[in-house]
C-alpha cells in the first residue's frame, strides 16, 4: 500500500496511519524533529501497540526485532543504516519533501524505495503550487515507470509535468531571465483528478473557519514617510523586486509591520512604527475573555519586540507545557506559523482567539495555522475569532490567500495605499 492522507488538522491523521498499518511488523516514522517526542511517541503508546525507539536508541543498539516503531526526524533520517526487511514507512508532514532536488527529499526517497508500505501525511499538500504534489509523488514512487503506470506519462519527470500542466513565463532574477511556471485552475483540477488514485478519502473537521475580523490599524504620517524612504533609498525595487516575488513580499511584510533589518544577517532591526503592535496590545487590554490572545508572526524581530514591550509574554509551546496556575497570568502568546506543527496539539483547549500581524502567502498555510485552534475537541466551537490588523498590505495578501490575485500581482502593485 502506498497512499497519501490529506486529512484536515485535528481529524486524527496519526491514528489513522497507524490503524492502516495495524498488521505491519516494523514501522519507520519520519517526521519533524519537534514532534518526535511530543506527538509521535505519546500517540504510539495511546493508539497502537509495540515498543518504540528513537534515533538516539537506534545509534546505540540498532533496530531490535522486538521494537515495532522507529521514530526519526527528517534531519536524522540520513543517519539510518540497516532496517528490517519488509518495514513500512510513515512520512509525516510530507510537504517537507516537496522539492525533489533537495537533500531531504532524496534521503526519504531512498528510504521509500526500500519500504513495503508508504503512507504520506499532510494537511497542506501543496503549500506553494502544483509542483509540490509532484515532488511528494516522486518520494512515494521513486521510479518513473511506477509513476507513469499509475498517473500517466506527464508524471515521469518535472519537465514532462510542467509541459502538461503548466504555462511558462519569464522573469528577471538578479539580471538574468529565468523561466517559471504558473498553473491554471483547470490544469490543477486535472492533475488532482489523476492524483486522486493515490489519496485516501479525505476526512474533514466539519468546523468552518470563522469570518475574518478586520481591526482598524491606521498608520501614522511618520510611518508612511519611513515606509517610502525604505522602499526608495534602500533600492527595494531594484534589489528585491528583481529577485523574486516572495523575497519582495517578505520585505514588504516587514515594512508593513513597522521595521526593517539593518544588516543582511538580520542581526539588527530598525523600528520606525508600531501601529500594528498597538492594535494587538489594544485588543489584548480590552479583552474580557479569560483566555489569552494568540499572536501569529513569522519574524523574529517582531517576536523580540513583543517580548520587550509586553510582559508577561511567552511562546505557544512553552505556554502549553505550563501548569494551569502558571498560564493564568498570560494575556499574549506569540507563535511562528512556519514552525507550528503537531507539537502544539492541545492548544485548542486553552486559546480561542488569534490575531495575524503578517499573513502567509497561501491558503494552505493560512488554514493549517488557524486549524491549530479551530479544530475538533475545542471547547470554544462557534466562539473562536480570527483577527487581522486592517492595513493595505494585509488586504492585498488576503486577496492572494483567497485566490483573487497572485503574489506576483500584488508585488507589482508597488503603490500600497
Regions found by a protein language model. Give the residues of each.
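Conserved RecA-like P-loop NTPase helicase motor core
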Residues: 73, 303, 312-397, 403-404
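Conserved helix-turn-beta segment of the N-terminal RecA-like "Helicase ATP-binding" lobe
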Residues: 35-59, 140-144
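Conserved Walker A/P-loop ATP-binding site and its immediately adjacent core
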Residues: 16, 23-46, 127-132, 298-301
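Conserved P-loop NTPase motor "coupling/switch" region that bridges the ATPase
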Residues: 88, 105-204, 378-382
Amino acid at each position: 500500500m502506498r497512499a497519501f492522507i490529506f486529512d484536515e488538522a485535528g481529524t486524527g491523521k496519526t491514528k489513522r496511519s497507524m490503524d492502516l498499518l495495524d498488521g505491519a511488523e516494523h514501522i519507520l516514522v519520519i517526521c519533524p524533529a519537534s514532534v518526535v517526542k511530543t506527538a509521535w511517541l505519546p500517540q504510539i503508546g495511546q493508539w497502537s501497540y509495540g515498543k518504540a525507539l528513537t534515533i538516539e536508541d537506534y545509534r546505540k543498539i540498532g533496530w531490535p526485532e522486538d521494537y515495532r516503531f522507529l521514530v526519526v526526524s527528517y534531519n536524522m533520517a540520513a543517519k539510518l543504516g540497516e532496517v528490517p526487511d519488509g518495514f513500512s514507512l510513515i512520512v509525516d508532514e510530507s510537504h517537507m519533501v516537496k522539492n525533489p532536488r533537495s537533500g531531504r527529499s532524496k534521503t526519504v526517497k531512498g528510504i521509500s524505495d526500500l519500504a513495503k508500505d508508504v503512507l504520506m501525511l499532510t494537511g497542506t499538500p501543496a503549500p506553494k503550487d502544483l509542483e509540490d504534489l509532484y515532488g511528494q509523488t516522486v518520494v512515494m514512487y521513486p521510479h518513473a515507470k511506477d509513476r507513469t503506470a499509475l498517473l500517466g506519462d506527464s508524471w515521469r519527470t518535472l519537465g514532462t509535468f510542467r509541459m502538461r500542466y503548466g504555462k511558462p513565463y519569464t522573469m528577471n532574477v538578479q539580471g538574468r531571465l529565468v523561466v517559471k511556471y504558473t498553473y491554471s485552475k483547470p490544469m490543477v483540477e486535472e492533475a488532482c483528478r489523476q492524483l486522486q488514485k493515490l489519496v485516501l478519502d479525505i476526512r474533514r473537521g466539519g468546523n468552518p473557519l470563522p469570518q475574518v475580523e478586520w481591526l482598524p490599524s491606521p498608520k501614522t504620517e511618520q510611518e508612511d514617510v519611513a515606509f517610502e524612504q525604505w522602499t526608495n533609498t534602500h533600492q527595494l525595487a531594484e534589489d528585491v523586486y528583481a529577485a523574486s516575488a516572495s523575497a519582495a513580499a517578505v520585505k514588504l511584510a516587514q515594512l508593513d509591520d513597522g521595521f526593517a533589518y539593518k544588516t543582511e544577517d538580520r542581526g539588527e532591526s530598525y523600528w520606525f512604527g508600531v501601529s500594528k503592535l498597538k492594535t494587538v496590545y489594544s485588543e489584548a487590554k480590552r479583552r474580557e475573555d479569560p483566555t489569552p490572545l494568540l499572536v501569529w508572526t513569522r519574524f523574529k524581530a517582531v517576536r523580540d519586540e513583543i517580548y520587550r514591550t509586553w510582559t508577561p509574554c511567552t511562546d505557544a509551546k512553552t505556554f502549553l507545557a505550563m501548569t494551569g496556575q502558571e498560564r493564568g497570568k498570560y494575556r499574549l502568546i506569540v507563535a511562528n506559523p512556519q514552525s507550528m506543527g503537531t507539537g502544539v496539539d492541545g492548544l485548542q483547549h486553552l486559546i480561542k482567539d488569534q490575531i495575524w500581524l503578517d499573513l502567509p502567502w497561501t491558503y494552505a498555510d493560512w488554514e493549517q495555522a488557524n486549524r491549530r485552534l479551530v479544530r475538533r475537541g475545542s471547547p470554544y466551537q462557534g466562539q473562536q475569532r480570527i483577527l487581522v490588523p486592517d492595513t493595505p498590505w494585509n488586504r492585498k495578501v488576503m486577496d492572494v490567500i483567497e485566490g483573487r490575485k497572485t503574489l506576483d500581482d500584488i508585488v507589482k502593485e508597488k503603490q500600497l495605499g
